[in-house]
């Protein structure tokens, strides 16, 4: 949080360091390199490193510049900064040591970056971690989370007190082994799986860019914040990072500033064993501005100058490559994989204390450091109060825009929004549920200000175009439709970031259902981080036909019920599609998957929005006393087959109940009484019909029932022929029903 320091003895130097908008004059940077032999820098013993790691990176067209810094004399503030940085290092060391588990290397190497961001640059209110216009910070290299916890503690967040630091990685702790937004206020997104964090950060920056273009006025700028990221070599290797960073450059997200912790160490050893590309040139090719900080260990002014330069580049994101030493200060383990993922050990901790001149007990914060950081609480409150005053004026001048803005920032949707959803009758012409989905999306876009999203280069197949809006582009940032390209994994993670930016955002993303395999990592993080992304997944079965088994998601319907906190919804017609959207929009802390058909389906008697909310419900029943002869259970496109089979069985005098099973998860949440009313336990004659794997269905049909499905890969042929050959037919259901009742 940028603000002036309370240290009255400091001169102009203090202002230069503490205020982000101060313009520092720049002079050519000196080459501050980690020595190539064992020596000391600023009194700290360092292990030898390979000088080739520190060479300038060049290309035919340009050389990636090092950050330009101003030569400043050492003052009291330098000593305070050094003590503050070492406080961060030792809080991390001590917490990992006490837990005997964790990753001390990154916090030790990245402490200077973290200090400058949280103490000098970022704007936030520690007592209100959810203040809208705060700067966002994402630790994409989530294993180094003690860096962020130490920073939150120093900054005055109530979520990380001293006693919390002592419970790191323990049962019931508020500071788990990787950052979790739902556990620790001040943590924006859940990170840990490498690459997810930088992709989430792209989503956060995209949300800021969209809101700024949509709501800022020439006389009223109410959206103005940055997204800062620290990512490591591992993140850089992940494909999801490439996907998301490609889009960030394409969209020109100028308020995204990423610090690349260039320490050249992976779990298996030096990154030279597997990672030798020029990250600098790759990011330049992606459309990023690139700066190199050659001394991330002690080059505080280099880091400050890099941030200052990054903020002058408004038309593209910035990557600041910061060359650091992992485990900086550890005389025997720094610059090695041994400091990455395990405690230093008592002897090395003591040696590090000696090496860095740290005489304090574990978890101690020196008084001068505590006093220095304490200013963030009143200054954060002041920043928020100033913004509130500005927004109050905005609300008077632009009441309609303010109402939409508040819906997005508070998560309070307009009253009666669900009434905008279309309704259908059996007389309504049938259609594919992907087409019905587009009708619902466009209806909701008119009443929910925060609804936005896009497709992975399949918008015309997924039917996800918002007809009343255009495409979000570098020059058209007000628009709500995003073109993600063929980047499924990045798309999902970007939508997580959008969702977690503000509670009223309702992001959706779309592709073929089979390609959830490409984005499952992001979908799992959606579920874990309570991000209510809507996944619009079309072409949900063999019903897509001729494209064949590579595109037919035989196993997809059965794999997601195993994932906690995610809703799978497979609607059968228009009313069920509308009901699925109602459920998905209402569940802002649970992601939803809508599995939608390519084939045209009729609007069936008995379906309803209210039924979908129960997960499973009866659509037709000619039995009495809750004692049908047989229960037919269908989902999606196979509910029509179940309904027709029920009609045939009734002609033969059978009492048949047909149940639509839209969502296992929603059905499981219902009362025992309700579940018994739909699937009475004494009726064991049950048949399920779904054009996918039968895995899991015996939990529903029981040992005496039958599950009709597909337990092998599909085939390339017209949809009707495949259904016939695989036995997903009315005749097969009738035969199965007769065999069990």
UniProtKB/Swiss-Prot annotation:
Keywords: Calcium, Chloroplast, Magnesium, Membrane, Metal-binding, Plastid, Thiamine pyrophosphate, Thylakoid, Transferase, Transit peptide. It is found in: Plastid, Chloroplast thylakoid membrane. It catalyses: D-sedoheptulose 7-phosphate + D-glyceraldehyde 3-phosphate = aldehydo-D-ribose 5-phosphate + D-xylulose 5-phosphate. Mg(2+) binds at residues 233, 263, 265. Pfam families: Transket_pyr, Transketolase_C_1, Transketolase_N. Homodimer. Residues 1-66 form a transit peptide. Residues 1-33 are annotated as: Disordered. This is Transketolase, chloroplastic. The keyword Thylakoid applies. Residues 1-19 have a biased composition (Low complexity). It comes from Spinacia oleracea. The active site is at 488 (proton donor). Residues 24-33 have a biased composition (Polar residues). GO terms for molecular function: metal ion binding; transketolase activity. Signal peptide: none annotated. Its EC number is 2.2.1.1. InterPro entries: THDP-binding (IPR029061), Transketo_C/PFOR_II (IPR009014), Transketolase-like_C_2 (IPR055152), Transketolase-like_Pyr-bd (IPR005475), Transketolase_bac-like (IPR005478), Transketolase_CS (IPR049557), Transketolase_fam (IPR033247), Transketolase_N (IPR005474). Pathway: Carbohydrate biosynthesis; Calvin cycle. Optimum pH is 8.0.
């Amino acid at each position: 949080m940028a603000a002036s320091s309370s240290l009255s003895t400091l001169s102009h130097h203090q202002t230069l360091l503490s205020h982000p908008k101060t313009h520092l004059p720049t002079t050519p940077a000196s080459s501050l390199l980690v020595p190539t032999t064992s020596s000391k820098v600023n009194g700290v013993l360092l292990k030898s490193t390979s000088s080739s790691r520190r060479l300038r990176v060049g290309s035919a067209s340009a050389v990636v510049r090092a950050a330009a810094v101003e030569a400043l004399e050492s003052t009291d503030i330098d000593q305070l900064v050094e003590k503050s940085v070492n406080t961060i290092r030792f809080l991390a060391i001590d917490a990992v040591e006490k837990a005997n588990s964790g990753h001390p290397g990154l916090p030790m190497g990245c402490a200077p970056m973290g200090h400058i961001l949280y103490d000098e640059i970022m704007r936030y209110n520690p007592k209100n971690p959810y203040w809208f216009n705060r700067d966002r910070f994402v630790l994409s290299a989530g294993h180094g989370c003690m860096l962020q916890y130490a920073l939150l503690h120093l900054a005055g967040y109530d979520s990380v007190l001293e006693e919390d630091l002592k419970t790191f990685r323990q049962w019931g702790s508020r500071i788990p082994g990787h950052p979790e937004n739902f556990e620790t206020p001040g943590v924006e997104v859940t990170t840990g799986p490498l690459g997810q964090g930088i992709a989430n950060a792209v989503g956060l920056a995209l949300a800021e860019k969209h809101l700024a273009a949509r709501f800022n006025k020439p006389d009223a700028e109410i959206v103005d914040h940055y997204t800062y990221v620290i990512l490591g070599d591992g993140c850089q290797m992940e494909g999801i990072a490439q996907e998301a960073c490609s889009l960030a450059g394409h969209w020109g997200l100028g308020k995204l500033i990423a610090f690349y912790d260039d320490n050249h160490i992976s779990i298996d050893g030096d990154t030279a064993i597997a990672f030798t590309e020029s990250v600098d040139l790759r990011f330049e090719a992606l459309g990023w501005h690139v700066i190199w900080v050659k001394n991330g260990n002690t080059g505080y002014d280099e880091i400050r100058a890099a941030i200052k330069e990054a903020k002058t580049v408004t038309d593209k994101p910035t990557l600041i490559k910061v060359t650091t030493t992992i485990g900086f200060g550890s005389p025997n383990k720094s610059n090695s994989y041994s400091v990455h993922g395990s405690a230093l050990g008592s002897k090395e901790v003591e040696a590090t204390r000696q090496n860095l001149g740290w005489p304090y007990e574990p978890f101690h914060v020196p008084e001068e450091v505590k006093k220095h950081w304490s200013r963030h609480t009143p200054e954060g409150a002041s920043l928020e109060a100033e913004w509130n005053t500005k927004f109050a004026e905005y609300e008077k001048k632009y009441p309609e825009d303010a109402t939409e803005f508040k819906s997005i920032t508070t998560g309070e949707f307009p009253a009666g929004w669900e009434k905008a959803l279309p309704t259908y009758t059996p007389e309504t012409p049938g259609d594919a549920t992907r087409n019905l989905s587009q009708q619902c999306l466009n209806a909701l876009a008119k009443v929910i200000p925060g609804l936005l999203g896009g497709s992975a280069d399949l918008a015309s197949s997924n039917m996800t175009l918002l007809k009343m809006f255009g495409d979000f582009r570098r020059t058209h940032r007000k628009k709500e439709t995003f073109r993600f390209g063929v980047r499924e994994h990045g798309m999902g993670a970007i939508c997580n970031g959008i969702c977690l930016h503000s509670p009223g955002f309702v992001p959706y993303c779309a592709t073929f259902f089979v390609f959830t395999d490409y984005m499952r990592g992001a979908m799992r993080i959606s579920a874990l981080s309570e991000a209510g992304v809507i996944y619009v997944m079309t072409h949900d079965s063999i019903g897509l036909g001729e494209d064949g088994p590579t595109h037919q998601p035989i196993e997809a319907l059965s794999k997601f019920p195993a994932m906690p906190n995610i809703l799978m919804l497979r609607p059968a017609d228009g009313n069920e599609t509308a009901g699925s959207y109602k459920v998905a929009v209402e569940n802002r802390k649970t992601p939803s998957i809508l599995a939608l058909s390519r084939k045209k389906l009729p609007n069936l008697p008995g379906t309803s929005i209210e039924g979908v909310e129960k997960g499973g419900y009866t659509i037709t029943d000619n039995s009495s006393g809750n004692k049908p002869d047989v229960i037919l259970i269908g989902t999606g496109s196979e509910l029509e087959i179940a309904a027709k089979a029920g009609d045939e069985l009734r002609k033969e005098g059978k009492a048949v109940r047909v149940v639509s099973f839209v969502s296992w998860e929603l059905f499981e949440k219902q009362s025992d009484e309700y579940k018994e009313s739909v699937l009475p336990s004494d009726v064991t004659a049950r048949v399920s019909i779904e054009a996918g794997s039968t895995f899991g269905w015996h939990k529903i049909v029981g040992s005496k029932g039958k599950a009709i499905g597909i337990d092998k890969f599909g085939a390339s042929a017209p949809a009707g022929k495949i259904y016939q050959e695989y036995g997903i037919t009315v005749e097969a259901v009738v035969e199965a029903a007769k065999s069990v009742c």
